[in-house]
Amino acid sequence: MDKIIKTISENGSFRAYVLDSTETVRTAQEKHQTQASSTVALGRTLIASQILAANEKGQTKITVKVLGTSSLGAIITVADTEGNVKGYVQNPGVDIKKTATGEVLVGPFVGQGEFLVITDYGTGNPYNSMTPLISGEIGEDLAFYLTESQQTPSAVGLNVLLDENDKVKVAGGFLVQVLPGAKEAEIARFEKRIQEMPAISKLLESDDHIEALLAAIYGDEPYKRLSEEEIRFQCDCSKERFMNALATLPKADLEEMRDQDQGAEIICQFCQTAYHFDQNDLEELIRDKS
């Protein structure tokens, strides 16, 4: 079971979220049949969405769009406050490019562009906020977004580790944020600890990477666990939703599908589920337009 653990330092100066998103990213890889770099890029963006949604309350949805100019194309993910996340990468077939230490690079395949966050509170007026991509490695881009757009100094680590067959071995991350009222000496101490932390990939390789992340973040600093919540890859698509989308098409288009194609098929971009609409389904929509 994937989870996010929310914590706060005992003095109330910082909060930290740590995530195990292994099954979430593994499910995304299986559904989209992504190659190595596409898997890591999509996985990191899914984790970024989970982190942002964890900051919200009520029935809020967070959409993250990584709009790069390179071969991956757009990466779109949507997370809600119930722990659900879905997403896709425009080009799932971008294969591996590794550093000397074996880490999968995604920045060169993301390229330059924008990091766009859409916050939907369910009121019909979603809030858009955008910052430039500074590295394309997603974690740094999320930290820059939080610091610039939300005016909250933040440290972020996200990664997806693959096995020798380029399948997801482990995925997770962390967010550390300064809270109002933190003293300069406390901020400096935490900044030093974050700078000296082992690489996120090393921490994820630990037997219990959740505890390894917390130990690296807090060191000897006392902290409280506020909550532990389940997170998962879960798409909210349905045949009814796509039926409603078909209903917006002109009557002539529906008649063409009925007569020439003997039906229609729609594949959900987010989870690759195929929905089939036979001639009777289309006839029902056509009658509604008469």
UniProtKB/Swiss-Prot annotation:
SUPFAM superfamilies: Hsp33 domain, HSP33 redox switch-like. Disulfide bonds join C235-C237, C268-C271. It is found in: Cytoplasm. Under oxidizing conditions two disulfide bonds are formed involving the reactive cysteines. Under reducing conditions zinc is bound to the reactive cysteines and the protein is inactive. Keywords: Chaperone, Cytoplasm, Disulfide bond, Redox-active center, Stress response, Zinc. It comes from the Bacteria. The keyword Cytoplasm applies. Gene3D superfamilies: Hsp33 domain, HSP33 redox switch-like. GO terms for cellular component: cytoplasm. It holds the Pfam family HSP33. GO terms for biological process: protein refolding. GO terms for molecular function: protein folding chaperone; unfolded protein binding. Belongs to the HSP33 family. Redox regulated molecular chaperone. Protects both thermally unfolding and oxidatively damaged proteins from irreversible aggregation. Plays an important role in the bacterial defense system toward oxidative stress. This is 33 kDa chaperonin. The gene is hslO.
